From Swiss-Prot:
HAMAP family: PyrC_classII. This is Dihydroorotase. Its EC number is 3.5.2.3. The lineage of its organism: Bacteria, Pseudomonadati, Pseudomonadota, Gammaproteobacteria, Moraxellales. It comes from Acinetobacter baumannii (strain ACICU). Pathway: Pyrimidine metabolism; UMP biosynthesis via de novo pathway; (S)-dihydroorotate from bicarbonate: step 3/3. Its cofactor is Zn(2+). Binds 2 Zn(2+) ions per subunit. InterPro entries: Amidohydro-rel, DHOdimr, Dihydroorotase_CS, Metal_Hydrolase. Zn(2+) 1 binds at H13, H15, K99, D247. One of its GO terms (biological process) is 'de novo' pyrimidine nucleobase biosynthetic process. It is an enzyme of class 3 (hydrolase). Gene3D superfamilies: Metal-dependent hydrolases. GO terms for molecular function: dihydroorotase activity; zinc ion binding.
Amino acid sequence: MNSITLLQPDDWHAHLRDGLALKRTVPDLAKQFARAICMPNLVPPVKTVEEALAYRERILAHVPEGNNFDPRMVLYFTDHTSPDEVRKIKESEHVNAIKLYPAGATTNSDNGVSDIRKVYAVIEQLEEHQVPLLLHGEVTHNHVDIFDREKRFLDEVLSPLLKQFPKLKVVLEHITTSDAAHFVLEQDRNVAATITPQHLLFNRNDMLVGGIKPHFYCLPILKRQTHQTTLLEVATSGNPKFFLGTDSAPHAQNAKENACGCAGCYSAPNAIELYAQAFDQVGKLERLEGFASHFGADFYGLPRNTSTITLVKEDNLVPESFDYLDNQKIIPLHAGKTLQWRKV
């Protein structure tokens, strides 16, 4: 197969940041996707529908002319989120979900939920109104090994949560383990998962063997190859529980390449080509459209896109860097390497 045409894909998990960063991040994402779930972990975080709509306007100001990119907004779940905010989400045209970060789990997550039992009143409303709860699925206790944090979250947090709220709509974001894949498969249709390009294409050897490569460092961290293999199997299976979410996370080069570098891979500029490469490597390119363009929209209850994109099989050199912020650079995922697919 030398070319493939798909309904325009959506990104159900992306970080755009705010302020000057939007000049870089919004056009990069808008060239690839029709819609994106825009993460709320700003400083300060996006905690109300009003704040989300104001952030959406700041994003729209950077969408290139002639592009119909539609930012879909999310609220940041805190210990102090009001149950009434769920009703406002349900009534909003542009806000689609609420995101739970365990406090301290990832970038700008200090305001996250400290104990999920504290917010059961809000979760009751989420279940009643069928508003999706998006989960960063890791525990954050210092004594838990970083490679075990996703599995422990499933056992200690998510399993009890779904017993208490069996109809809750849940997206387990950026899954990285066989444990998470099998957990999602075992649940009813109300539980789904997103998968990033880096967790399909790479594993922890790519990050750690032959020198530490900070641009592969993200959270949840890359796992061993056996987990990567399982993620590829479920992503390419045609199962509608699994769909595209890049978790594209911009950090300036100097914030990644230092003694305590930030977590996040910037995949937005070549995201759909990265996914195409992963699907093609296992001979499942015909399954890409469902994963990228159908299943996420279906889960969120939104119409599928009607426009299309075409990918052709030809060498596509990923740039070494892009301009970012004031006189800084950002290094994209797979910088300087050649992909086999190009969006035309």
